[in-house]
Amino acid sequence: MMVQDLLKIKKNEYYTMKNIVIAAEYATRLGELTKNFPKPLLKIGNSTILGRILDDIDKIDDIDEHVIITNHKFAPIFEDWTKEQNYSKKITIIDDGTSTNDTRLGAVCDLLYALDKLNINDDILVVAADNLLFFSFSEFVDFAKSKATSCIMCHEEPSIEKLQRTGVIVVDDNMH
């Protein structure tokens, strides 16, 4: 290996990361609104929930592909949506084969299914597609690269009502 090749590696020119978007939920709590339409593709202003997420992540140089894992019921809708998009990174839709909320795989199994199906060995950014976010993932990706280990993003939520509807972690004083 030449010195210039080592410098390229040091500058992360060979570093790649896949963005895996978990979009296989059935959003049953939203009733008729999402009975036959995926929650991540609901309109928010001039975009969609998923569109807002990808607009941000697509700008991260280290990301080389967006992998969207969805269910069989909504896969054709995601495929059609993808054809209308103009992101700089490739978008791959993965159908997890489930057709009902009762047969869903769950987020972790969907992630494992996508990793196995595409034989992904790169670092990954895993994002839930059903959350409206108001921040950029760029700093988080830089942080994860600098730590060279698994990183989990979380935020403090003071509302007990909101905490009762979501996953909760408990941390000690050593959390960084």
Feature annotation, model-predicted:
Residues 9-10, 57, 121:
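Low-complexity, intrinsically disordered/propeptide-like segments
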Residues 76-173:
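Conserved beta-loop-beta/alpha segment of the NTase-like Rossmann-fold superfamily
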Residues 176:
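Conserved FAD/dinucleotide-binding core of flavoprotein oxidoreductases
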Residues 1-16:
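N-terminal amphipathic/basic-hydrophobic helices that include classical n-h-c signal peptides
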Residues 5-8, 34, 116:
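Compositionally biased amphipathic helical and low-complexity segments enriched in hydrophobic
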